[in-house]
Design a protein with these regions (language model features):
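Alpha-helical recognition segments enriched in aromatics with Gly/Pro capping
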Residues: 1-82, 196-202, 206, 229-230
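Amphipathic alpha-helical segments within well-ordered protein domains
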Residues: 19-20, 33, 76-79, 96, ...
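Hard-cation-handling environments
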Residues: 85
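Small-residue-rich helix-loop
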Residues: 88-187
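Charged substrate- and nucleic-acid-binding regions of tRNA-handling and nucleotidyl-transfer enzymes
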Residues: 171-234, 242
């Protein structure tokens, strides 16, 4: 029997669902199987097992006869580890189930390598990727209020000029970093002063991955378009709002 963390019989409220429900939530079958196998059985301190290891090591006689507790956090952790471990080709196939096809995207490897480090489910993986690929339709109000200041427009325009001069070299993270770090030092900026307004302009929020990665994935034309849009529209409106509040 599987109990909830309080020791009572597991119900749907606690996480007891149909297998397809887990699929729809973005869990990989290997992670779910690993989780179920470990509920009443162990092999020392090992937590993660390949299918081959499960077949080789699992012994029904070693199953614990007492009730086991459902731990949703453990399942999420296992799923995140499997997402990091499986091939990018496999992740591309999993994402198709959620209507995202990266098969022919020129930066699919970079997108997946970056996003799978943060995702606990395939649903989260999709969101992390689309946050980068989709042009933002709104901007995080709290982030704009905190990081967009009166001088933000000036140094973002300077930074855009720098990117344009080096636009042929923005194809990898190392080049973007090499171009950006001297700019930050020369203009007396702190990293959040530059990076957080850029994150907001490019993705709509402040919790996106590294700015270097995003720029290398999107390329100059898309980065320029999104930054210019943010400067002309949202950031200016925010300054007006703040001035009206003063």
């Amino acid at each position: 029997m599987i109990n909830n963390p309080s020791g009572k019989k597991l119900s749907k409220r606690d996480g007891a669902m149909d297998v397809m429900d887990y699929k729809n939530l973005g869990y990989l079958p290997e992670a779910l199987l690993n989780f179920l196998v470990r509920l009443g059985w162990s092999n020392g301190d090992q937590e993660i097992f390949s299918m081959e290891e499960m077949l080789e090591l699992f012994d029904p006689s070693n199953i614990n006869k007492s009730s086991s507790s459902y731990n949703g956090e453990k399942l999420l952790w296992l799923n995140s580890e499997y997402i990091k471990a499986v091939s990018n080709d496999r992740l591309i196939e999993e994402l198709k189930f959620f209507d995202l096809d990266l098969s022919h995207h020129p930066k699919r490897t970079e997108l997946l390598d970056l996003s799978k480090q943060r995702a606990q489910t395939i649903v989260e993986l999709k969101k992390s990727i689309t946050d980068i690929l989709d042009v933002p339709t709104s901007y995080e109000e709290a982030g704009v209020k905190k990081f967009v200041k009166e001088d933000t427009k000036d140094f973002l325009e300077k930074y855009l000029e720098l990117l344009e001069k080096n636009k042929e070299d923005l194809y990898n993270v190392e080049n973007v970093e090499e171009i950006t770090k001297p700019f930050i030092a020369e203009n007396g900026l702190k990293f959040p002063q530059l990076f957080q307004p850029i994150r907001i302009a490019l993705t709509g929020g402040t919790q996106a991955p590294s700015v270097y990665d995003i720029i290398a994935i999107l390329g100059f034309n898309e980065v320029s378009s999104r930054l210019e849009t943010a400067l002309k529209r949202n950031f200016q409106n925010t300054w007006l709002f703040k001035n009206n509040q003063a």
